[in-house]
Structures are given as structure tokens and as C-alpha cells.
């Protein structure tokens, strides 16, 4: 967008006079204006480096996935869970094939659907009957349950109905109309002590429901009639809602009503994977499990991190020339082929990208705002040296963790510790304890009392001096940087 005005030239023109049939009778004298060519734009990007970075990034992310996939169904992290030890359940991988449309679930009911696809479709139909009945009980039954007393599965369905269907997708439940201080609203959102029926009935009585979104009746409807119409609308909507169906698939997998083996079979049947390889023969013969097949295919990038849209599924690489500041590579993964969106737009391709859970339209290199991690350590080093809290001759001892602040201690990536480190050693080893201690000293006063705001202001000062509070100036959409205002 930014460079378009530079590239774009000016059309030429000429005034002509024509008769009724369009025949040129006369060309206006001195009316001709020659076209003006647009200006050239010169990129600093190294094409080969850009391509290489994309490939390396994809391989690295795939490697992280493979290293963390475990043969488990679910995993729940808590506040004490070390992020570096969080596994990826293989059932999440199977579900991702459906959830991010790697597998075409619409083909399950096609005339030429395979036997495996038909079995999966039949399992979904049974599940739909079961869940629609349970949802209807919560909407219209006489024995409804408070949200907190529902099963985790039913809580997921009910939350989807309220948050996704009624609010995000249709706008029936109006965000602007809801009184967030209302006691019934709090009972639903915070205390979870009322049922779906109670909440929506109350919402109808308070005019939080926009009836024009689902009813074309011109007559006045009281709150009871509004709720009856709304309940019927919800049931009808869910019956054709693909996103809701995908939720059902998740629990079909967890209940082993459909299997990873079936989904891997469908990958071959739908042409996502090629049957012309050794893995297919081993899988077909029963010598290769569904999990091992997925690990093989992720490793070989026949199934990519972008397709699965698990965590992690994205990344970025920016390489600059330190001598000139020129950008040599600016890579966001996953990307897309923008040639298919120019001139004659490929609308099917656009829709696919727009629904892709790995968000390919979002440029991670220029728009993602996240903690910089170890790349910020040189800033801490500069601040420490400049403020005199460390010197070139000082040594800081790393025993594997930093525990001078309240709360959970911060572990170094080397749990056994690095021992005594100089500033050079601290940078070379990217030691968490060394730089935590440096930041801690930045927040101490003359008496040795620590103040976290003082430490933060010192770090912010040097981050700003180094220009980290400003955009880079790349000629593409770029998020404004935001230096943190609190300690992690």
C-alpha cells in the first residue's frame, strides 16, 4: 500500500469527437497527454535469504512440534507449569486436521464419500442428536443446571452458544446493551450460578436481545415469546453450523468414537498425503501407527505447522545489515501467495486464508507485539553498565534460579547454573540469572532497598534511547512498539 503511490504512474489521455455510431470524426488539437511512467522501488531484501529464512523457520517450528507431541489425550497446564515442559497431546494433532480444515469435512457426506468418511459422518450424526437434545434441555427444559454444574463438555457448548453464536457471529446478544454491573449478568459470567435458560430469559426481559436479527414478525412479542423464538433459532442455527460441528468432532475423538487412524486414512483418500511412499504402505499394513505417521509427516513437512495451527504454528525472522541498517530479510510464517490475490482474485483461496487458524494474513514480523525475551538482554547490559550497577570486572553468580522477588522464582535455562559470570560471559551464555540480578540492582536505592518501578523506569529509559519505542520505518503495516510498564 505504502509504495503503490510511488510505483503508480499517470494514464495518458486524448480528446476525440465521435458520431452517433462511435466513429471518430476529429481528434482534438493539442489535447494529447502522454502517459507518465511510475517510479522504481528498490528493495534491500535478499530474495535467496528471504526464501532460506522461511524454510528454516518452518523446519524449526515443525521440529518443536515433533519434539513435544506425546501419546496423551489432553493436558491442562496450571500456574506452576513450566512452559518449556508443556506437551502437545497427539489428540490435539488429530483434532487440528479437522479444526483447521486440513481434512474437508463437507466431503464426508458427498455422493462419492469413502467408507471411512461415511463412518465418521455417521458418528457425527449420532453425536449431534445427543448434544442437540441436551442443549434443548438447557434451553427449554424444566430441570436446567447452573453453568458451574455442567460437565466440561457441556460448558464448552453453552459458552459457544452465548459468546460465539449470539454475540460474535450474529450480534443477537448485544454487547452494548448488556449492563455489566447487573447482578444476573455477574451470576452468569463470574459466579456461574445460573443456567443458560435463566440467563437468556433474563436477557430477553432486559432488552439485551436484538429480536430483529432472528425474527421477522411485526407484532409485539413479550419476553417469553422472544425467548421461545430465540431457542428455536439457536437449535436451527446449530444444525448447520460447521464450527459447532467441529466442537463435536473434538469430543468424538476424545471418546474414541472416531480415531486417529481413520483421520490419517482420510488424509490419503482426500489427496492431502501422497500414497506413493513407504509410509503409506506401512500404515496400510498396520506396521505404522497413526501417531508415528503424523510425526513422520510433520518432520518431512508434508503436514506443516501452518496446517495444524497448533501452538507453536507461527514465527518470524528479521535480518538487518548492522553496518547500514538495511533490512535483508523480513519473514513471517505462515505466509501466502499474494499473486493469487492480485488482479483476478482467487476468492476461494482468499476465503481459505481468512478462515485459517494460523492467521497467515497477520504479519508476525511487523505486527506481533510480544515480549522480546533474550534479545532484550543487551539492553539490560547497557543499562547496568551505564548506571554503574555492574562493571566490566564484576562477576555475578548463577546457581540456576533467581529468587529475590516475591512469587515464583525465575529459573535459568541451565537449571544447574552457570556459576560466576562476567558481563561477557552473561551475554555469551544468555544467562537469565545474570540479567535478572542486573535489573534487580537497577531498582535498588543507596540503602539496597528494591523498588520495581525504579527498575522498570531504568530499563524503559535505555530501551527508548536505543529506539525501541519507535517503529522501524519499513514500508508495510507495522504495529507501534510498547515497552512494558511492569515486571514479568
Regions found by a protein language model. Give the residues of each.
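Intrinsically disordered, low-complexity regulatory segments
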Residues: 5-8, 49
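Beta-lactam-recognizing serine transpeptidase/beta-lactamase-like catalytic domain environment
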Residues: 16-34, 45, 66, 70-375, ...
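Conserved beta-strand/loop elements of the cytosolic catalytic core of P-type E1-E2 ATPases, chiefly
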Residues: 39-49
Amino acid at each position: 500500500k505504502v509504495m503503490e503511490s510511488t510505483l503508480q504512474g499517470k494514464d495518458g489521455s486524448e480528446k476525440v469527437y465521435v458520431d452517433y455510431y462511435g466513429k471518430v470524426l476529429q481528434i482534438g488539437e493539442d489535447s494529447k497527454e502522454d502517459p507518465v511512467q511510475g517510479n522504481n522501488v528498490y528493495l534491500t531484501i535478499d530474495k535467496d535469504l528471504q526464501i532460506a529464512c522461511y524454510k528454516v523457520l518452518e523446519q524449526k517450528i515443525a521440529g518443536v512440534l515433533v519434539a513435544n507431541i506425546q501419546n496423551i489425550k489432553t493436558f491442562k497446564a496450571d500456574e506452576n507449569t513450566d512452559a518449556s515442559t508443556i506437551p502437545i497431546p497427539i489428540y490435539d494433532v488429530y483434532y487440528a486436521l479437522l479444526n483447521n480444515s486440513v481434512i474437508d469435512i463437507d466431503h464426508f457426506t458427498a455422493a462419492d464419500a469413502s467408507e471411512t468418511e461415511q463412518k465418521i459422518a455417521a458418528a457425527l450424526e449420532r453425536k449431534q442428536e445427543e448434544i442437540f437434545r441436551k442443549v434443548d434441555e438447557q434451553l427449554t427444559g424444566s430441570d436446567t443446571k447452573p453453568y458451574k454444574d455442567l460437565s466440561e463438555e457441556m460448558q464448552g457448548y453453552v459458552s459457544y452458544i452465548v459468546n460465539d453464536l449470539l454475540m460474535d457471529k450474529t450480534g443477537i446478544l448485544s454487547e452494548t446493551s448488556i449492563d455489566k454491573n447487573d447482578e444476573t449478568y455477574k451470576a452468569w459470567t463470574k459466579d456461574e450460578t445460573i443456567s443458560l435458560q435463566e440467563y437468556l430469559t433474563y436477557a430477553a426481559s432486559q432488552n439485551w436481545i436484538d429480536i430483529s436479527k432472528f425474527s421477522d414478525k411485526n407484532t409485539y412479542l413479550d419476553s417469553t415469546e422472544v425467548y421461545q423464538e430465540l431457542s428455536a433459532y439457536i437449535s436451527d442455527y446449530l444444525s448447520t453450523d460447521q464450527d459447532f460441528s467441529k466442537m463435536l468432532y473434538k469430543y468424538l475423538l476424545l471418546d474414541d468414537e472416531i480415531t486417529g487412524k481413520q483421520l490419517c486414512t482420510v488424509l490419503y483418500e482426500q489427496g492431502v498425503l501422497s500414497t506413493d511412499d513407504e509410509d503409506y504402505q506401512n500404515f496400510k499394513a498396520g506396521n505404522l501407527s497413526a501417531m508415528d505417521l503424523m510425526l513422520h509427516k510433520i518432520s518431512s513437512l508434508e503436514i506443516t505447522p501452518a496446517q495444524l495451527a497448533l501452538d507453536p504454528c507461527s514465527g518470524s525472522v528479521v535480518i538487518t545489515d548492522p553496518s547500514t541498517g538495511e533490512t535483508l530479510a523480513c519473514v513471517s510464517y505462515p505466509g501466502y501467495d499474494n499473486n493469487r490475490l492480485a488482479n483476478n482474485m482467487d476468492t476461494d483461496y482468499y476465503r481459505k486464508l481468512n478462515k485459517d487458524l494460523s492467521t497467515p494474513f497477520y504479519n508476525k514480523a511487523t505486527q506481533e507485539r510480544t515480549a522480546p525475551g533474550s534479545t532484550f538482554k543487551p539492553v539490560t547490559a547497557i543499562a547496568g553498565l551505564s548506571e554503574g550497577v555492574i562493571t566490566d570486572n564484576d562477576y555475578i553468580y548463577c546457581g540456576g534460579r533467581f529468587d529475590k522477588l516475591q512469587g515464583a522464582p525465575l529459573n535459568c535455562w541451565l537449571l544447574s547454573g552457570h556459576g560466576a559470570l562476567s558481563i561477557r560471559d552473561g551475554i555469551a551464555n544468555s544467562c537469565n540469572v545474570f540479567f535478572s540480578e542486573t535489573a534487580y540492582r537497577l531498582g535498588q536505592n543507596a540503602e539496597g532497598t528494591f523498588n520495581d518501578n525504579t527498575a522498570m523506569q531504568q530499563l524503559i529509559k535505555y530501551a527508548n534511547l536505543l529506539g525501541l519505542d519507535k517503529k522501524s520505518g519499513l514500508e508495510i503495516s507495522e504495529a507501534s512498539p510498547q515497552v512494558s510498564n511492569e515486571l514479568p
